[in-house]
């Protein structure tokens, strides 16, 4: 499912504008915080698509039934640019497992490259919901390589 967050009127547009602004980009702390905020907003939007199951909760007055996320989530990122975005997702999916991929471009010429995966840390993905986050999407090649590597090491999500 594709959900383009900046096509709707919401606060995320402010954070995206600041990420793209050449003057704001110079403020490293603000840049990282905005990526984290975008991760948090993305987590909220993603949560609408996940599986839920009823859970009984004891309140001070009585038992109450609450719908809670039933998916087992793994949040994965491509190091290092994705770390603030990853943290934003974890702020909401705080019981999620983590996966990390270290990848880089290996150039054969000025215009040709392939993605090399250097390192991976990944739990089993079998039967789990994988959220692969990377803010540095240009060609999409790193994202594809990361996904294929994660599945090769952790199984099919």
Residue spans for each PLM region:
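PRPP-associated nucleotide enzymes
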Residues: 1-157
């Amino acid at each position: 499912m594709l959900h383009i967050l900046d096509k709707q009127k919401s606060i995320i547009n402010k954070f995206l504008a600041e990420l793209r602004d050449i003057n704001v980009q110079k403020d490293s702390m603000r840049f990282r915080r905005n990526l984290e905020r975008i991760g948090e907003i993305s987590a909220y939007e993603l949560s609408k698509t996940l599986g839920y199951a009823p859970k009984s909760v004891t309140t001070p007055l009585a038992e109450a039934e609450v719908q809670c996320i039933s998916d087992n989530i793994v949040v994965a990122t491509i190091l290092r640019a994705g770390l603030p975005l990853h943290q934003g997702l974890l702020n909401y999916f705080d019981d999620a497992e983590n996966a990390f991929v270290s990848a880089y471009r290996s150039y054969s010429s000025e215009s040709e490259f392939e993605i090399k995966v250097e390192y991976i840390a990944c739990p089993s993905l079998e039967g789990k919901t994988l959220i692969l986050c990377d803010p540095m999407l240009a060609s999409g090649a790193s994202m594809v390589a990361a996904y294929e590597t994660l599945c090769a090491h952790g199984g099919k999500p």
